Amino acid sequence: MRDFLRSLKLCAACLVGLALLSPLAAQSPADQHAAEGTVNIYNLDRDAHVGGVEIHGPISKAVVSQAVELIRSIRPDVDDLKVFLSSPGGDVLAAMELGEEIRKQWAWTAVDEHGECFGACVLVLAAGVRRIPAPENVGLQRMNFDQKEFVASLSPDKAKQKYTGVAKRVETYLARMGLPKKLFQEMAAQQASAKVRLLDAAKLKTLGLDGSDPAYEQWLRENSNEQPARSNRE
């Protein structure tokens, strides 16, 4: 937490003039439109009770709204609902909102060899009751926040206070998802760098990003590996 706050002091000083934490702030409207994320239903077979949702591009409030709507729409007909991720990052608060819905719906998260999951996307990956990432395709990166909320009319001190609050929310969120403290610590350390730190297979397991939620696994054991009743997760 201390390292995170130290980096936030530097970031807060940057906010007023440079808005370094959000690349979208410096883009033209056309570029922003091109960079918008998309959400689609993937491989849905209601008779076989399989299917998922795939997310491509930056994670924003609009993307989260679409994803939540699709997840809820197919959840009653799917046993192992999977959320496939390919995102360079995005809005931290939006990512945690999506993560909360994913965990509520007992969905899996996955990043295949053709995808990527950096920055805020890692918060979404962390929410899966089972997490299946491809090594070297998941990376820790400096977090981005909604510019309108964090920059407009804020002094450096006020901005730092807001970032401190968000840091605590991220820490609490990861703990609630059952991830080790080490993940938050390493995400915090990455705030001081503009580079992406790719995670190999061993690191993904150490940080809890490759594996299952213990509570989910316990439920499966106690119920002879049956899936939770779909009606209970609506």
Q: Where in this protein do the model-derived segments appear?
A:
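Glycine-rich beta-to-alpha active-site loop
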Residues: A94, R103-Q147
